[in-house]
Design a protein with these regions (language model features):
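Short, T/G/N/S-enriched strand-turn elements that build extracellular solenoid repeat scaffolds
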Residues: 58, 74-85, 97-109, 125-131
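Short, basic amphipathic alpha-helical segments that act as recognition/interaction helices
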Residues: 2-4, 21-22, 33-57
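Short Lys/Arg-rich basic patches
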Residues: 1-18, 27, 36
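Short, positively charged interaction helices/loops
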Residues: 48-80
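Detector for repetitive beta-architecture
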Residues: 62, 67, 86, 92, ...
Length: 132
């Protein structure tokens, strides 16, 4: 069965009563369909506003953008070459469920993810000192 990858991550934010009231007013007046629509739009607008700075940082830090999946086969190939991966992802990095903690430790030197890392609890625990 194929592994299901979530298309989004749930976050929780705390807002002051006045800010929340303003959001509710915008929703009530029909500018947005709901609070989530307002918050997503605000986030997208801020990301667009800072897009040039983000592009420069991505290039400078040599970060992969988007979804990057590491299969057991990928890591076995890396192990065969004697190399170590230094994973840098902005988005979602996922390590297949059939990757053992031993294989992960033998092939992954470091992980820096701006976004989310999906891996088994055992693999995350084994790599804990390598996750930045």
């Amino acid at each position: 069965m194929a592994e299901r990858v979530a298309e989004s991550e749930k976050i929780t934010i705390n807002l002051g009563h006045v800010d929340l009231g303003h959001i509710d007013l915008m929703v009530q007046e029909g500018f947005y369909s709901n609070r989530t629509d307002f918050i997503r739009t605000a986030i997208r607008n801020q990301l667009e506003r800072h897009a040039d700075a983000a592009k420069q940082a991505i290039a400078r830090k040599r970060v992969e953008l988007g979804l990057r999946h590491f299969s057991r086969e990928d890591l076995e190939e890396v192990r065969a070459t004697g190399q170590m991966l230094h994973i840098r992802v902005l988005g979602l990095a996922s390590i297949a469920g059939d990757v053992t903690p031993e294989l992960a430790c033998a092939t992954i030197g470091s992980i820096a993810v701006l976004g989310a890392l999906h891996a088994s609890s055992a693999v995350k625990a084994a790599l804990l000192d390598r996750i930045r």
